[in-house]
Amino acid sequence: MAKTQSPLQWLATTLIRGYQVFISPFLGANKCRFHPTCSTYAIEAIRLHGFAKGSWLAARRILKCHPLHPGGIDPVPPKKHRCNK
């Protein structure tokens, strides 16, 4: 069963997809030094962690994307479940 997105999650992921389809192709192929790309990471983070935390994770990731950072494989961290015992 698919989890429904909040309106903010939907808006953010739609805007990022728009960037991927309409803007990114004109910036050159494979400019991102990370795998997955920063935009794919942002979509995954927002879908998994929600709008607020996912956006924070995406912003941190984008701030790491510069020539002095080596890049590499950087997956979205898994969601931590709270134990209410």
From Swiss-Prot:
InterPro entries per record: Membr_insert_effic_factor_YidD (IPR002696)
Signal peptide segment: none
Subcellular location: Cell inner membrane
Stretches assigned to coiled coil: none
UniProt keyword Transcription regulation present: no
Domain of life, source organism: Bacteria
Record Pfam families: YidD (PF01809)
Gene Ontology cellular-component terms listed: plasma membrane
Keywords: Cell inner membrane, Cell membrane, Membrane
Keyword Transmembrane helix listed: no
Topology with respect to the bilayer: Peripheral membrane protein
Main location: membrane
Family: Belongs to the UPF0161 family.
Described function: Could be involved in insertion of integral membrane proteins into the membrane.
Database matches in NCBIfam families: membrane protein insertion efficiency factor YidD
Record's protein name: Putative membrane protein insertion efficiency factor
Taxonomic classification: Bacteria, Pseudomonadati, Pseudomonadota, Gammaproteobacteria, Alteromonadales
